[in-house]
Curated annotation (Swiss-Prot):
Protein name: Putative 2-hydroxyacid dehydrogenase YGL185C
Active site: 293, 322, 341
EC supergroup of this enzyme: oxidoreductase
KW Ubl conjugation (keyword) present: no
Keyword Oxidoreductase applies: yes
Protein source organism: Saccharomyces cerevisiae (strain ATCC 204508 / S288c)
Keywords in alphabetical order: NAD, Oxidoreductase
EC number: 1.-.-.-
Note: Present with 1430 molecules/cell in log phase SD medium.
GO cellular component, one term: cytosol
């Protein structure tokens, strides 16, 4: 589970998640000479604190939290950070491989001057050769593209019927809920439609939202609108994307959109943003895709909208009570598409996120972080 106590005076990096073992940084001579590596598999909060107590003599200068971070033990809370065994004296930073940072007591980290870094690849990192800019946004956008296509064309539902029937004619007729020849465009009282020329509203236009917009515009031929608290003039001018302010005025504009993609972060302000009032203003037959956080959707209101036809398709990569997936969502395979929070789950992102996290540690410990902390430092 863990290494033995330190026998050298080198600063220690605690890994609570497995890094990419082939990482160039991890395996570099400079990294190995500079740091001692300590590994621990999280189990319970009490076991973790006991582990830290046994390693109080180690100079833990950084924690590599990877993707799962401290979710298994209830997050990085004040009670952990201010526990007598927590290495506040030497700990300079905690690094994540994910964009999200739910479950962190940011105020307490700030109080004790412990930096938290998340994954960002929107600017170059000179310590990494061949960094792929916007990789995570690109890969999450692929997920959005699939869910949007599912909404318009229902390919997975047709695939299911094809496997069940073993006959192309029967599969199409079963989808149409009629006997005789079926062209394939009918699904009961719904139709498979082309996304070309349809209007899509993207809620949030950060690095992920922008990549979603590019793929939907240039890949599917959709007309892009975006909604946030302030206009991105560069995108509005260069790409002719139409801006809408994220406030009460958005309700009167929702009727025009065939699809809405949520890429907003989970905050108190965005919780249940997609509620009954929001959906009542939407065009019947809406395709709704959520890549942000599960709690942005009021699940009861969304479920009711699926029943009434206000929503024709719901695509989810994040869920309200994650890791659990609501039974109603799972069982409605004709009206929903679901992926298990894997929008960014590619080999490319896994490897690059590790390199970026390790270079953050190198920069912070060496005192060089100030030049680039504006694009990946949380606190």
């Amino acid at each position: 589970m863990c290494d033995s106590p330190a026998t050298t005076g080198k600063p220690t990096i605690l890994f609570i998640a497995d890094p990419c073992e082939t990482s160039a940084t991890l395996n570099s001579k400079a990294f190995k000479e500079k740091f001692r590596i300590l590994r621990y598999q999280l189990d319970t909060k009490e076991a973790f604190l006991n582990f830290l107590e046994r390693h109080e003599q180690d100079k833990i200068c950084a924690i590599y939290a990877g993707f799962p971070a401290f979710k298994k033990i209830g997050g990085m809370t004040r009670s952990i950070i201010e526990h007598k065994s927590f290495p506040r004296k030497n700990l300079k930073c905690i690094v994540l491989c994910s964009r999200g940072y739910d479950g962190w007591d940011l105020d307490t980290l700030r109080k004790h001057e412990i930096r938290l870094y998340n994954y960002q690849d929107d600017e170059n990192e000179k310590l990494i050769d061949d960094l792929k800019l916007h990789q995570v946004g690109n890969d999450v956008a692929d997920c959005a593209l699939w869910h949007i296509l599912e909404g318009f064309r229902k390919f997975s539902y047709y695939q299911k019927l094809s496997r069940e029937t073993g006959n192309t004619l029967t599969a199409r007729a079963k989808a149409a809920e009629k006997s005789g020849f079926a062209f394939g465009h009918e699904l009961g009282n719904m139709f498979a439609e082309s996304p070309r020329g349809k209007k899509c509203l993207i809620l949030g236009l950060g690095s992920i939202g922008k990549q979603v917009a590019y793929k939907l515009q240039y890949g599917l031929g959709m007309e892009i609108h975006y909604c946030k608290r302030s206009e991105d003039c560069t995108m509005s001018q260069n790409e002719s994307w139409k801006f809408h302010l994220l406030d009460e005025t958005i309700y009167a504009k929702l009727y025009q959109f065939h699809a809405i993609v949520v890429t907003l972060p989970g905050t108190p302000q965005t919780e249940h943003l997609i509620n009954r009032k929001f959906l009542e203003h939407c065009n019947p037959g809406l395709i709704l895709v959520n890549l942000g956080r599960g709690k942005i959707l009021d699940l009861r209101a969304v479920s009711d909208a699926l029943v009434t036809g206000r929503i024709n398709h719901l695509g989810l990569d994040v869920f309200n009570k994650e890791p659990e997936i609501d039974e109603k969502i799972r069982s409605s395979d004709r009206l929903t598409s679901i992926t298990p929070h894997l929008g960014s789950a590619t080999k490319d992102v896994f490897e690059q996120s590790c390199e970026l996290a390790l270079t953050r540690i190198l920069r912070v410990v060496s005192g060089e972080a100030a030049s680039d902390e504006h694009f990946s430092r949380v606190v």
